[in-house]
Amino acid sequence: MIPPQEASARRREIEDKLKQEEETLSFIRDSLEKSDQLTRNMVSILSSFESRLMKLENSIIPVHKQTENLQRLQENVEKTLSCLDHVISYYHVASDTEKIIREGPTGRLEEYLGSMAKIQKAVEYFQDNSPDSPELNKVKLLFERGKESLESEFRSLMTRHSKVVSPVLLLDLISADDELEVQEDVVLEHLPESVLRDVVRISRWLVEYGRNQDFMNVYYQIRSSQLDRSIKGLKEHFRKSSSSSGVPYSPAIPNKRKDTPTKKPIKRPGTIRKAQNLLKQYSQHGLDGKKGGSNLIPLEGRDDMLDVETDAYIHCVSAFVKLAQSEYRLLMEIIPEHHQKKTFDSLIQDALDGLMLEGENIVSAARKAIIRHDFSTVLTVFPILRHLKQTKPEFDQVLQGTAASTKNKLPGLITSMETIGAKALEDFADNIKNDPDKEYNMPKDGTVHELTSNAILFLQQLLDFQETAGAMLASQVLGDTYNIPLDPRETSSSATSYSSEFSKRLLSTYICKVLGNLQLNLLSKSKVYEDPALSAIFLHNNYNYILKSLEKSELIQLVAVTQKTAERSYREHIEQQIQTYQRSWLKVTDYIAEKNLPVFQPGVKLRDKERQMIKERFKGFNDGLEELCKIQKVWAIPDTEQRDKIRQAQKDIVKETYGAFLHRYGSVPFTKNPEKYIKYRVEQVGDMIDRLFDTSA
């Protein structure tokens, strides 16, 4: 049971809460009424706004649509006016551009091309929209005139600014490849930069709009002429320079002229010039410039000319490669890609044909020289052939994409030169063997025969062209001729590819064949001499000359490839001839040789028969000595070392024999006039022998 006080308190608390809740409820009711009122007010406002908006829309939309229609009409009018202006402009193109077209593109190419573009568009418009319009014919004619003017401008620019490359610049360009030190690259500027831009611009327009390829023919004709003239100018430069100074150019000349190359001259082949120098060197070494030398030195005038022509041709070949490379770079900028190869092929034909024709002329001249047995002239083929082979990779690269007939020209020339070179080598060997001249040009003093000097000289030239000469022989499959087995490794790659070792062996065998033929011929020629001693001197001189020449020119190393004992064999031949010569003195020394002398008892008076025998011995010795000295004085042993050796050996023998004879019989009273028989002292005999082989004594 809750106490009354607590229940009363609880009731008051509940009443307070109820009162509080009633107040809250009253507040909520008031708030709801206010909210409803606000909602009604808002709905009323929105309804009013919507009504007004609808009224506004109903009044604005018609105005907007009307404005839009007006704007569309305005745009259509503007477009129509623009189209009319555009169409009308085509009718004015002819009059607007006629003056520019008439005056031509010179000096204002871009403006001219702009006018041509307008004319082109006018032509297209009238063709599409009014093909019967007289305006079409007018703009067509104007376009054709404009195109012709552009073609004329192209020709004019190419003609005016295409210059022949000077020989000096060409020589610098060629020598640049051989320079070891770093130098500025030699650049060929065929056309000035501004002109090149115009030419390129015109060519592109003609290809794109002109639909005309005639300008390509104009291009290759003009450039072909300049290329050909540049090469001919270089050749003429060599001829003029050689006629004025003896050589095409010389860096040793202190005062450089304007036609002097700025770089070092490249190494000249100088085949004939080198031949002359070698011949002089060996003739001086072997002949002391006295006997037998005069008929061995070739005519320098003709050989100088051959030398210049050879050098000129080699330089022209190199110049062609450099110019062709430069021409192709220029052509790539001007000519459309799909026409470049064909145009380039046409461009180089004249210059290439000229080089090939000159090469064939060289082959023809060599063929005639072989018939005349003028083998020194044939030597010009060797440096040219070597250079052509060295240049062939560049040639092939330059001629990529050209016609097969163009590509085959150089290989054809190389084959012709190899064939004629191989024939020259074979004919030379046969000529050495079968040389018919015996008495006609035999040296009366027994000195070196011209055939020997010429043969050695020819072989010496092959040292500089070992690979070329070996390839000549190998290309003609001459291995069987020299009985050299072919190594499968040397022939497996291709029929014309031979190793350098095989070529060296082949050339060595060829040289040995020539030397063998020469030796046989010399033996035959030596029989012309009636005196065996002079025959021996002749063979000695020739064998010694051959050996010394082989040693000095390093031919001996090449010979030793297939003939290891060649040097020893020649020394034995030389010694044999010395011994043969020494036997000629037996008819002198036999008179006073101890084995042929009678024995006299000392102190016993000589009988008349004995005195007469001693007189005959002295007289026979004196007469024989005088006769031999007189005869052999005019003989020649050009090699100083050999001459002194032979003199000394003979002097020792004769002095010893004569000294012993004189010692035995000089004091014997075999005559009342001893000075009549004892004409010479031992020293005098030695002096007489010292004067052998010396025409100046």
Swiss-Prot record:
Against SUPFAM superfamilies, the record matches this protein to: Cullin repeat-like (SSF74788)
CC annotations in GO: centriolar satellite; cytosol; exocyst; Flemming body; growth cone membrane; plasma membrane
Coiled-coil annotation: which residues? Answer: 5-42, 63-85
Any matching Pfam family: Exo70_C
Where does the record place the modification Phosphoserine? Answer: 133
Q: How does it assemble?
A: The exocyst complex is composed of EXOC1, EXOC2, EXOC3, EXOC4, EXOC5, EXOC6, EXOC7 and EXOC8. Interacts with RAB11FIP3. Interacts with ARHQ in a GTP-dependent manner.
Put simply, this protein is called: Exocyst complex component 7
Q: Which organism is it from?
A: Mus musculus
